[in-house]
Structure formats: C-alpha cells, structure tokens
C-alpha cells in the first residue's frame, strides 16, 4: 500500500523545522481511492534529533478526529510534557469497522499514516501506540491483531473485542494473530449496555471483559490470576468506583490491565462518567512503558514492576473534596498515582 500526501492544512506553526513550536495540523493523504484526513499534534518540546513516539487516538462511531481530541480524549497536555506526537485520524463515514466486501481497509490506512509521518518527523518506530473509544477501541484491538508489526501496545475504552467467528465470518478479517507479546489496557463500564461494549459481552459477536483478559493473558503468557487494587474513590458524586486488575509477568515482561469501572456506563473516565481516574493519563502511563519488544528495560528474570510502589506515575492531584487542581502551597492536597498509591501532601512556603 502506498500513500501520497496531497495536503497539509496548518493550524499552528511557529517554526518550519518544528523546533520549540506547538504544531497542530489537519493533514490529508490519498488512500484507497479517496482523500483521508487525520489530525496531528506535535508538542513544542519535539526535537528532530530524538526518536519520538506516536500515540494514535481513534474516535467512536459517527465521530471524527477533531471531535475525539476536543470532546473525549485530549492528549495535548500530556504530549507537552511526555514528548510524543498525538494522531487523531477520521474514519470513512465516521466508522472504522467495514464489513467485506469493501474497499476500506483502515488497518493499512493507519500504516500509511505511520509511513507518512516517518517521512517528515523522527518517529520512534518501536513506540507506536493506539487507543480508542467505543468503535475506536474495537479498532485498536484490530490493530493489535493485524498490524502488530507496527503497533507496540494498545488500550480500549468502552469498546469490546470481536470474537474470531464474528471477525472472519461477518467482516472477512483474518483471525486475531499478534506477532509479539502485546501490552493491553482496557477500561470497561459494568452497566454499559451498548451491544459492542457490554461488560458481559454479546456472543457470538463481542467478547466479555473476562474473555478479553483471558485472550490476552494467554497470548502473553502472564500470570493466570490478577492483582486487584481498589482505586481511591476521590469523587463520590460520580456514582462509580474503579478496580485495577493487573495480570503480570508476561513474556517480554508485558502485562494486561483492566480498569473496571463499577457502575460505569459508555464513558471516557476523567472526561465524562467516572472521575476517579483520568483515562487519557492512565493510557499513556501504561503504554509508554512498552515498545515493540515488550516492557522497556525488561529483565526477564524479575517480575513486572508496574504495581510496585517505587515505580509510580502521577495521575492527578485533588483537594480533600476530590476536585482536580494543580499543586499549591499551604493547602492539603492528595496525589494519586497509577499504582493505587495516594499521598497526602502539604507544601509550605
């Protein structure tokens, strides 16, 4: 498959060489007989001499890349400090999953985007990640299944995984066959009644949350039983809580993580629905630990360190009422980390 970039609509550009400039572009490539759009965000700290990760974000059915960024999963503030390029493609007709026979094969559209960006930016090809909401989450699983030679790790929010029977018989896709151990995070809601994201699944079409964890823990050869940690219920008004379930010690040190939103609906936690976690930050904290070869700096003789208390990433800061805010002096604040640890802190002048 070949891509020809025919348009780059520049929204913000300070330097033509992308040095010390925030860049947000809507770009277009000619693919599959039509012009296809995707949005990119390049943080000001991007350095052309440093290989930089890509983070794909896929919208839900009926959406588009801009809407995904503005109303669901805005990863720009995270990219500004973590230094990755955020990519928001738009699906044809607002969809990612097209049944055979069809001229749309968005798996290779994504590959065309990777190649297009790699021709202009210094992309770390070992650190290309994908996440999505609803149908975009389902599509992220498809990338892990069918483009695993380019995708290091994936995450899905409120989107299930298709069964192989449904994938092959109805869509004409090959069976899921990842080529390497793949770190996977998924964030389902237990009362989500959308057919393609029900916690209990919808056989023979979509897997349950248990089926998804079973598939990936078996593929990755992780521990069979998860470590379960209750996430602090910092927002008691959202009507939901979160349990973190981690299957550790997989091949190449990869893990599988489920952030189970008890009483959660078809939501993106941190934006709407549950507010105890920020799904965007959780996803980046998780996938960024991995490259195409597994956990970065993996030591195969030791256990995965994702849940060790000395290995933690700050998720958010809240006041005693659970409200988000930045670190402040002379106030009580609670620092929430991705391993379940909560620190109470007062910074004095």
Task: List each language-model region with its residue ranges.
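The feature captures the conserved acid-bearing segment of alpha/beta-hydrolase catalytic domains
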Residues: 152-153, 159-240, 246-251
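A domain-start/cap signature at the N-terminus of enzymes
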Residues: 19-54, 85, 102, 131-155, ...
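Residue-level detector of functionally pivotal "anchor" positions at catalytic/ligand-binding pockets or at interdomain
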Residues: 292-324
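C-terminal tail/sorting-segment detector
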Residues: 332-349
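The conserved beta1-alpha1 loop
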Residues: 56-60, 158, 188-189, 262
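Serine-hydrolase catalytic machinery in alpha/beta-hydrolase-like enzymes
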Residues: 25-45, 49-129, 133, 139-142, ...
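Alpha/beta-hydrolase-fold serine-hydrolase catalytic core, especially in secreted/extracellular enzymes
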Residues: 182, 217-303
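Bacterial Sec-dependent N-terminal signal peptides
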Residues: 1-23, 303-306
């Amino acid at each position: 498959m070949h891509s020809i970039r025919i348009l780059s609509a520049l929204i913000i550009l300070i330097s033509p060489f992308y040095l010390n400039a925030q860049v947000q572009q809507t770009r277009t490539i000619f693919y599959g007989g039509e012009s296809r759009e995707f949005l990119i965000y390049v943080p000001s700290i991007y350095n052309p001499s440093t290989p930089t990760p890509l983070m794909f974000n896929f919208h839900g059915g009926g959406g588009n890349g801009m809407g995904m960024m503005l109303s669901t999963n805005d990863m720009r503030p995270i990219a500004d400090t973590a230094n990755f390029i955020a990519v928001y493609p738009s699906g044809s007709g607002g969809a990612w999953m097209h049944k055979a026979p069809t001229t749309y094969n968005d798996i290779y559209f994504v590959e065309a985007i990777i190649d297009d960006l790699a021709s202009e930016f210094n992309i770390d090809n070992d650190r290309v990640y994908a996440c999505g909401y609803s149908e975009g989450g389902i599509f992220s699983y498809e990338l892990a299944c069918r483009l695993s030679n380019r995708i290091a790790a994936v995450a899905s929010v409120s989107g299930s995984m298709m069964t192989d029977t449904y994938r092959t018989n109805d869509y004409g896709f090959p069976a899921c066959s990842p080529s390497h151990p793949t770190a996977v995070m998924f964030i389902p809601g237990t009362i989500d009644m959308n057919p393609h994201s029900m916690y209990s699944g919808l056989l023979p079409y979509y897997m349950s949350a248990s089926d998804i964890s079973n598939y990936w823990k078996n593929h990755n050869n992780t521990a069979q039983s998860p470590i379960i940690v209750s996430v602090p219920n910092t927002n008691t008004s959202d009507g939901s809580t979160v349990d973190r379930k981690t299957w550790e010690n997989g091949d190449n040190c990869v893990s599988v993580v489920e952030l189970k939103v008890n009483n959660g609906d078809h939501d993106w936690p941190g934006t709407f629905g549950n507010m105890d976690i920020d799904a965007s930050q959780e996803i980046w904290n998780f996938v960024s630990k991995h490259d195409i070869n597994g956990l970065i700096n993996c030591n195969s003789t030791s256990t995965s360190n994702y849940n060790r208390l000395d290995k933690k990433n700050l998720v958010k800061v809240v006041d005693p009422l659970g409200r988000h805010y930045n670190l402040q002096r002379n106030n009580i604040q609670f620092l929430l980390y991705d391993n379940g640890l909560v620190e109470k802190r007062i910074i004095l002048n």
